[in-house]
Every structure is written in structure tokens, then in C-alpha cells.
Amino acid sequence: MERRRDRGGEGQKEQVVRREGLMSNERLTRPQLILSLYLCFGASLSTKLMDRLAKHRANFSPHDKYLLLNHLDKLASKSKLIVDSIFRPLYRFKAAMILRSQRLISVTAALDPSAYCETPVYNPDLCPNMIAAQAKLVYHLNKYYNEKCQSRKAAISKTIREVCKVVSDVLKEVEVQEPRFISSLSEMDNRFEGLEVISPTEFEVVLYLNQMGVFNFVDDGSLPGCAVLKLSDGRKRSMSLWVEFITASGYLSARKIRSRFQTLVAQAVDKCSYRDVVKMVADTSEVKLRIRDRYVVQITPAFKCTGIWPRSAAHWPLPHIPWPGPNRVAEVKAEGFNLLSKECYSLNGKQSSAESDAWVLQFAEAENRLLLGGCRKKCLSVLKALRDRHLELPGQPLNNYHMKTLVSYECEKHPRESDWDENCLGDRLNGILLQLISCLQCRRCPHYFLPNLDLFQGKPHSALENAAKQTWRLAREILTNPKSLEKL
């Protein structure tokens, strides 16, 4: 949802973005008490509470409070250990929580939004086992990272080298046929520029094109997540390196370039030295290669845009959120963005002529820059490993990019660097998993820089519902039994 208002007489508009499906940065930004209750009593909570949970309303009626207290009392009766595990990641409330005979007598004050404190404070007086439980979770997460995540990284690195050998050979053949498509796939600091890991068996290689200079970048917001390239002057048409791909209206067509590139790659596959192990993926307008019947690589022509920032992302960073700092913002915007020749669809699922000519915005380098420092990348690595092992579901509702997006939102909700110390890894992971459940229930996951773009668009509702249930089971297991990470 967005609200716009005119500022003065200049016609400038201020965009205020409200990210539905994500917790807004209001006074009570994280009602983790209710979310944690949901992890243990998801099916038994009332429909009304479920609705409130999905909408993240900060204020609750007396009846809601009664239901919550009743469930808390039942929970305390069942197990003091579970109570400790639930209250461990919560933030300080000005509350009197008394554990007597393994029963929770009163937590009414814990539901008071005015008592919320943004900074996590671990007070042994509130819950004696809280610090020990947190340390235990961090210990098992670090063990999981060192054993599972590092082995995953090593395996993927080996796969990337194998895949890039094949792709490089194919692109060399393309370049021989058409010198305008020059291979930009190169290794730098043990990573390949322009390569993105979608999953351990799926990759995307961005092929950067030259000479975008005679085109203007037009980003009017009519196509969420997309923009067009229009000739700056009709008289410059013949000066463009890509003259045959310019439409009658003066737009550089992403579809036409992709179609030409697909033809070239198909010819190159038949001529390259790896022709016995690589073949084109049929029934798609995208350029995809299947290598050794195990890996799929999408090769996408693109323009790299530096020194400018899209108008559809002009609201970022949000003025009331202190993260990231001015220096980091400058670095991120200096990284710029890419314009990818990929398919983009409107809400009705059909591609219009305007969309076929449009280019998809991508912020890969800017997003990587945001996640520098603290345990951010470690947290993302754990999430990716958990996704690969437990959330690779029918309909493919979740991918690594969803996890990356939620880590960025978590950084906004916890802007201080101290919030990302190694000893906070458990809290951050727990918060992101809870947020993922919320997004799946709401069937909406806004793009971090382009909140009008829903990353769940086109995903089957049944697949999202199934993913929400599986994520709930996973989060509950980690929350109540950190040692279970040894088997996850």
C-alpha cells in the first residue's frame, strides 16, 4: 500500500511505503510473544487471533488478551522448559513474569505495547535460563554453520567452476558469431562476476552488454520491477550498436535482444567442445542451458547502470530508519543496478507488448554491499542451507533470494551493529523465520528496494500455504530444541 501527497506547487510527490506482509517500523514492530505462541499452538489459536497475527496489529482487545493469557497458562503447565525457550528471544517488557510451581501466574503487562523496548536486554531476573538458552542456540548454530554451511559452500564452489567452464566455452562461440555479445564472465577474488546462485543446481549468469549511451533510462513505475530504454534522440537511431533491436517507438526491446541471443546460443551449443554434456532448455523464451542433466544455467543479457538510481527506489532509505548509515547508502547507490533482458509479467500473468520490451531491474551488487558486517552473511548462509534441506517444496515457493530479502528487512528492524554480533545470531535467525511465516501467510513478500513488486507473485497459494506449515515446523524445532540442528 502506498500513500502519495503533493509537496508545494512543484508537483513533486512524496512516497510513503507501507510494506504489507512485513512488520512496519512502528512502536511495536515485533509482537514476538504472539508469534512464538503461534509456533507452539498454531492450529489452536482462534481465527480472530490468526487474522491479527497476519496483520501485525499492535493493540489487542481484552478478549484477545484473555485468550493469550489462557494459552500461556496452559503452556506453562505443560513445560517450564518450553516457556523458557519461548521467552528467551523476546525483548524487554516492563512486566512481572513470575514462574511458580512451573506455572506462569501473570504476563498481562507483557502485552502492553508502551512497554516495548527496541534494544534486547537479557535479564536473568525475568527468566533464569534465558542467557543459557541463547548461548546454547548460538553454539549449535555456529556448529551447523561450520559443518553444514561450509560444506555446502565448498560443494557449490566446485559446481560453479564446472558450470563456468562450459558457459565460457559456449559464450566464446557466441562471440565468434556475433562480436556484440562479448563474454563478461570472469573470475575475481575467487568469485565469478555476474554469476548468481539460485540453488545448488540452478544458476544465473549475467552477460553485460556495451554501448547503452544513446538511450535514456525511463522508470515511471507503470511496470513494477521494470524499466524501459528509449532513444534520447530519434536522429541517433543509426548511431546505436543495437539499431535492429529498436522498436518503431524508439525503445530498445529486451525481447528482441533475448530472441537473437537465444538463436546464437543454440548454434554455439552445437559447436562448442562441451556439446556432449550441454543442451538448450526448450519451451522457454529465456536462454537456459542444462549441463550434465544436473545443473541449469540461465544466461541473461544485461546493461550495467552506475551513477544513477531508479525513481521507483527513490524512497530508500526510509527517513525514520537509521540503517544503513549515510556512508553505506552512498556505497550502495554507487554500485547501481542492472537491467536484465528477462520476462516480466503483469498481475494477470500475461505479457503485454510494453512488458516484452521492458527490462527487469536487478540490485545484486547493491544487496551484497548491504549485508557486509556482523553476522549478516552467516545468518543468510544458515537460511540458505535450511531452505535447501527442508524448504525445497513442490511449486518452488521459496528460493535463496527470498531469504536474502528478509535478511535486509531484519537489518532495518535491528539497525545497530551490536544487534548483529555473533551472540545475536540465534535471535536474528528466529526473527527472520517468524517473518517468513508471516509473509507466506499473507502471500506477499515485497522486494526490498521495490516494495510494489511482490516476490510471491504467481506462486500457487497451496505451495505458499505448504511452505508456511513447513517453516513453522522448522522454526518450532529450532526454537524449542536447538540441538535438533545436528539432524536438520
Regions found by a protein language model. Give the residues of each.
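A positional/structural detector of protein chain ends, strongest at the extreme C-terminus
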Residues: 1-3, 487-488
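N-terminal regions immediately upstream of nucleotidyltransferase
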Residues: 2-10, 17-203, 207-263, 267-270
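Conserved catalytic core of two-metal-ion nucleotidyltransferases
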Residues: 154-201, 209-359, 369, 375-389, ...
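Pol beta-like nucleotidyltransferase catalytic core
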Residues: 333-377, 387-488
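Composition-driven detection of intrinsically disordered, low-complexity segments
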Residues: 7, 15-20, 70, 299, ...
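Membrane-interface soluble catalytic domains
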Residues: 27, 298, 308, 484-488
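Generic recognition of cysteine residues
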Residues: 40, 117, 127, 149, ...
